[in-house]
Amino acid sequence: MKSDDSVWFTDPPFGILGNYEGHVATPELPTNVYRLDKSGQLTVATGDINRPNGLAFSPDESKLYVVEAALNPRVIQVFDVTDNGTKLANKRPFINAEPGGTPDGFRVDVDGNLWCGWGMGNEQQDGVKVFDPTGKPIGFIALPERCANVCFGGVKRNRLFMAASHSVYSLYVNTQGVKGG
């Protein structure tokens, strides 16, 4: 959720690619980054990304970070937020995952650091990787399983919740998640 009460989301096809329910489904809409404003109007913020996944705004909402999951290895792209906060432009790589690295859902703290769910079943990568506002790795929280998503919670937004393959973990951190994220 953005401060203007718009909801931004991606619609990747991951859950429908297989034959899990007895048939292979097809996407209803292209895999874009979408914006739903408070009046209910849905628009495409950008179509310039292949299989977008996790996304989060910078603390000042001038940038949007988005995982581009079709690339191998995956890349967290960064876009400038333009047109009075309604569109995205100037896509560029922000974090290139090393081979085998799989960034997924992530959140941003008040200092602009990215806390990224990460991994694909190996103990050197499974957990949460933390990157500073320039994309430099500054921390790692090891988990015994792949971490798919994270969020900050608690009264002070200083508790990190980590949704992993089979478990939810949490710990208190020395920062706060951005409001709304």
How would you describe each model-predicted region?
Residues 16, 42, 64, 73, ...:
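Flexible, glycine-rich phosphate/dinucleotide-binding loops
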